């Protein structure tokens, strides 16, 4: 949903196709996890997400995903950076693609424009009991923060029949300024949502960041749940309600309440440096239960390491 993201995505597609690489191009703005999910579904070599995540609106960026759907290792991204500094394939790496450049490039027979969101929703439906949740008489307010998570929750629960649940989305339209804030699920960015939670009596509030790979939450009345609280609740649910066991992985700036809960539930604990890229390798191991970071990224057993 950032300014000119479609143009950047098209340029990346052109360059990959010009190097005889098959490309699936999303037909709409999509969450970063949708790219990761599609990579795994298709057995792709990797993927690219055009996003600047939770950063200010003036920025855009280039996320690289590997064949497992996780963020590329630092060795890979550093190699790409060095290559850009030393190479200039097709004469396009130092300037924007113009109409003349497009005319010089070969056709794109290896490019398929398709939905990445639809198969992502199907993966989410397999990962959780969406039909059971959809039957619950819950009012949920979803703050999309003008990002690529817009519409996702509504579509997801429509797959479950949506018999009792009511999903209301706010800030779900495209605004390349993100309403004047950084699209990050922090309390000071969602005061308008806190007011609605209280006045309209919602049972739960969910907040996505700009590319919908991180989450925040609110309880009835509008009290903001920190990512620290969310991690503790997720771990409690997995160990107490589902009775799962396994390794608990956290970045070192996550609350020590996770340490204490891991101890009393008999789960081994691993603490990593900041950044989900340090957590993702543990998620590839069958004995890992959950991994999470302070900025709101979480992943659990049986899901993509993202």
Model-predicted segments: where are they?
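Proline/glycine-rich low-complexity loops and linkers
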Residues: 27, 82-120, 219-299
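Short gly/pro/ser/thr-enriched loop/turn and capping motifs at secondary-structure boundaries
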Residues: 30-33, 55-58, 71-72, 79-80, ...
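Gly/Ser/Thr-enriched, mixed-charge loops and adjacent short helices
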Residues: 60-200
